[in-house]
Structures are given as structure tokens and as C-alpha cells.
Amino acid sequence: MTAKDVAQSLSERIAPYADVRVVGIPRALMYHRLGTKWRTFFEALGREVVLSPASDRAVFERGQLLSVDECCLTSKLYLGHVAAVAPLCDAVFVPSFALPGTFRSYCTKFQALPDLVTNAFALVDEPVRVMSALIAEGADDKTEREGYVSLGIQLGATAKEARLAWKQAKKAQEERDAALAEAQRDLVRRIRKVPEGARPLTILVSSHPYVAHDPFVGGTVTDALRAAGAEVLFADEFDHAKALKKADEFSRSLPWIVNRELVGAILSLHEYVDGIVLMSAFPCGPDSMTNDAIARCVRGKPILTLTLDAQSGSAGVETRVESFVDILTYQKRGGYFHE
């Protein structure tokens, strides 16, 4: 082996993704929470970013064929998005989520996601080039930055360039989150200014962002609520830091950071809404525990619990939502005995 070969081999180990010019990001799972950060990071390093198309039945069915039965609905959908974006890019970004703290963890599927994707496609002899990194979202800045700097170096950037890209990405994500939280506060203020008798029905939708904001998963529910004339608030758009602090009033031992944020948002927005919709994708473990506790312990507002799966027809979901809205409307008017 020549010196040139040794140097090339060493370079490939240090920067295995240096040849990647187009990065594919599946439009599923944590893209709905962190997509702004990821896109900004890669673009700051001079990469082009392409997204998979919006979710639909075809994308899901492709993912279902690649998945085992035990995977949750959104994991199956994710595999479909990987299949859709893989031909459009040099590598697909599939991060692995570290556990930044005892009460700031994520569902364990996020740790194993790169292995899940790699093996699912290998089993059908359709290998996909996966670009991964261990990132600690929700940890302190130093710990989180280390994961992104490591990824940047693997892309061939210097540590300084990677730190700058992370800084830009973090700022863009914070601005996006702050804008959503401010828009929600503004909507609540505008609703409160309307006289009680003319105030629209206001419903809080609580679910993971990859359920609430995915057109194939939660889109039917939010569309049905709006079609019925309701104003819809999303728990995941509430200020994350305030939600985490408020969640301590509900439980100090709830381990999953996103579920803690959702609980805190429910407690914070409780007095401003007429009803709450709890949505989860079958068979989500964290949601099954958290939503049951919410239904038992959060009092004073009607709650509709929806568990969505591949067999959930839109007609059935729409019927349940419409019935829930009808009940809330009657209640708002004073019950069945109003004049």
C-alpha cells in the first residue's frame, strides 16, 4: 500500500461522507420537530438538501412492506419516506438520538433508527447509504454541539466550520420554535377578545409533532376539526421550556421529554380551550402510558382519545371527531336544556 493509499484510507475513516453533496431527509418522525435545524446545518456546510414527498397511502404502504409488524405506524411510515428520498440523494440522514438525561429521553426507537433503516433495506436487497450521527437533542449546548461537530467532520468540514454550522442551525431552530409559540399566544389572545357567546370552539390537539402535523397520520383529524368550525391549538407548538417546567406539577418522573412538554402545554392551555384531543400512533408505548394518565388526572375539560393505525379509515375518524365537536357545542350552549 502506497503512502497515497494510506492517506486516502485514513481520510475515508475520518470523513466517510466527504463525497456526499446531496443529503436526503425523510419527511417523517423528528423532521417535524427538528427539520429546520437539520436543513440549516447541512446547507451551512454547502450541501444540498432534498426532502421526501408529503406522506400519503403509497408512501406508507411501501414502508409497511419494509417493516416488521411490531413497529409503530410512524416508524413504518418513516421507512416509506426513506425509500422515497433515497434515489434523490447521495446519502439519507438518519440520526441516532442519545439520552441526554433521566427525564429527557426519547422513545428507544430513535436510538436504533439507523440500524433499523440499514437492515430493513438490506433484507430486501435494496441497500441504502445511511449517514448517521449520535446527537443529544435536549442536552446542554456543549453536549449537543459535540454530536453535530462530529457529523460535520465526517462530512469533511473542519471543527470550526462544523461549530459555526451548528450555531446557525440552532439559531434557526430557536427562531422557528419561538415564532410558532408567539403565533399560538396571539391566537389565544384574539380568541379571548371575542365575546363569550360568539367565541369559536377551541380545541387543543396533543400529540407528537410527527403525528399531529403529518397529513397521512393526523391530517384527517385536524382537517375534520377545522371543517367543523373549531380553532385548533397544537400542544407541541407551546413554548418548550415553559411546558417542561409546568409538567413538574403533573409528574416529576415522566421520562420522555416530548411527552413532558405535551403535558406541560395541556396544563398551561387548559383554561383557554373547550376540549382536548389526545392523538397517538398505534402502538406507541410512551403515549399509551402518558395519555392514560392525562385522561385520568386532568379534570374539567372533555377529552377525546384517538389511537391511529393503518386500519383507521378516514370516515371512522371523522365521525368520532364530529361527534366530539357536537358534544362540545351543546355544552358550550348550556347543555341539552338550553333555550
Where are the regions that the model predicts?
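An N-terminal assembly and electron-transfer interface module characteristic of large anaerobic redox
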Residues: M1-E339
